[in-house]
Design a protein with these regions (language model features):
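An anion/pyrophosphate-binding glycine-rich loop and adjacent beta-alpha core
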Residues: 36-38, 43-44, 52, 56-59, ...
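Glycine-rich FAD pyrophosphate-binding loop
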Residues: 5, 21-47
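Beta1/beta-strand and adjacent pyrophosphate-binding region of the FAD-binding site
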Residues: 1-12
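Glycine-rich active-site loop/strand segments that organize a redox cofactor
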Residues: 47-105
Length: 416
């Protein structure tokens, strides 16, 4: 009878336990977790609705004949391809349905039908209990001892160990970066780490005046004045900068490159520059504007507070008379609406970030099995590795896919 220890009771750890026990009912599986209950971080996924995957999770590109996963990042973007190919969104849906969890789509995003993360956490935990998985909770594991063919954790010997500790993000929900040191002790190396899928901090002179406002915008991130990322969606203005789904999507790059970046918001994405000019020109030429100031020039076409900030951002005084502005002034104001630029100063940190970008380098792990090339029987899955996905369900898909690969190898023993 093989014995496997799984360090970390998150989505990847719970899934790995179920895969192992389903394929080999006689196997002994123990999950160690530093929290008093498993799945705490999973409960917060997708604002508590649990965005499980995305129809684009298995979209692959090719670079010099080498396949890579388009929505995943890391030093080797090809590493995730095999796991995602073997266990993609369809396999995930089938797996969840086998546990009694039906799923549904919202646009390209996959959710449990209940739209409640607790559904997934509770069912995964209950299935583990039903299969005889042992839970050892409130246990902080810092060291994995090993002999020639065994691993020793808390005085107990195991044949295999799966490190599923996650990254550094949201320590209050369980991830504290401990997995990096465990794997480094066996000779593995860790990349530089960054908070990702988080809010972007910007110069605050103008955004503070818009605190609490939301607007659909096309968001472009520039590195040294060259565009590197773009996403459309609802942006939330905050006193520190910007939040919202499109901001989360591009935050990885802002985290890595910091104040070398600027962000540009197209606040009227459904209109061309010429269309916006015509709209503003029409307001300026309207007789009712004869006695108005620039304070209200944009009020007919966009939120009043946003309009006033754009006027000031473009260098005009709100007290200036509308009747005195020229076509050149209007073009400048329209440029502000189509490209509201803010200097990036950083991102919100690990306590808020949903994901850690970077991790244990994948070059010393087998991409088919997730097993270490340095220590047979040692596995790493999920976010602890240098694989992180875009916002939108990609990271949970990777958690399940990598768990499947590791569990399959453990139960077949082909590479042990």
């Amino acid at each position: 009878m093989s014995k496997t220890a799984i360090i970390g009771g998150g989505s990847s750890g719970l899934a790995a336990a179920i895969f192992i026990k389903t394929n080999d009912p006689g196997a002994a599986v123990t999950i160690f977790d530093r929290m008093d209950r498993v799945g705490k971080k999973l409960l917060a996924t997708g604002n508590g609705r649990c965005n499980l995957s995305n129809t684009a999770a298995c979209d692959f590109g090719s670079n010099n004949g080498k396949k890579y996963a388009e929505h995943y990042h890391g030093a080797d973007r090809s590493f995730a391809v095999n796991a995602l190919s073997k266990f993609g969104i369809n396999e995930l849906r089938d797996f969840l349905l086998s546990l009694g969890i039906p799923t549904t789509f919202e646009n390209d995003k996959l959710f449990p039908l209940s739209l409640n993360a607790s559904t997934v956490v509770d069912v995964l935990r209950l299935k583990c209990e039903q299969l005889g998985v042992i839970f050892k909770l409130s246990q902080q594991i810092d060291i994995i001892k090993s002999s020639s063919d065994k691993f020793i954790i808390s005085g107990e010997a195991f044949d295999n160990v799966i490190v599923a500790t996650g990254g550094k993000s949201q320590e209050n929900l369980g991830s504290n970066g401990s997995g990096y040191k465990m794997l480094e002790a066996f000779g593995h190396k860790c990349t530089k780490l960054y908070p990702s899928i988080t809010q972007i901090r910007t110069e605050t002179e103008f955004v503070r005046q818009l605190k609490g406002l939301k607007i659909d915008a096309d968001c472009k991130l520039y590195l040294d004045n060259k565009p590197i990322a773009e996403q459309f969606g609802q942006v939330l203005f905050a006193d520190y900068g910007l939040s919202g789904p499109p901001i989360f999507f591009i935050s990885r790059y802002a985290s890595v490159y910091g104040d070398r970046c600027k962000i540009s918001l197209d606040l009227m994405p459904n209109y061309s520059m010429n269309d916006v000019f015509d709209l503003v020109k029409n307001v300026a030429n309207n007789p009712f504007c004869d006695d108005l100031t620039l304070e209200n020039l944009l009020t007919p076409i966009i939120n009043k507070r946003i309009g006033q900030v754009i006027i000031k951002h473009c260098g005009y005084k709100l007290s200036a008379k509308v009747e005195n502005i020229t076509d050149r002034d209007i073009k400048r104001i329209c440029s502000g609406l189509k490209a509201f630029e803010l200097k990036v100063t950083g991102v919100n940190g690990y306590n808020i970030a949903q994901v850690t970008a970077g991790g244990i380098m994948t070059d010393k792990f087998d991409c088919n099995t997730m097993m270490s090339k340095l220590k047979p029987g040692l596995y790493a899955i999920g976010e602890v590795l240098d694989v992180d996905g875009d916002c939108g369900g990609y990271n949970l898909q990777w958690a399940f896919s990598s768990a499947f690969s590791a569990a399959k190898n453990i139960t077949t023993g082909k590479h042990r």
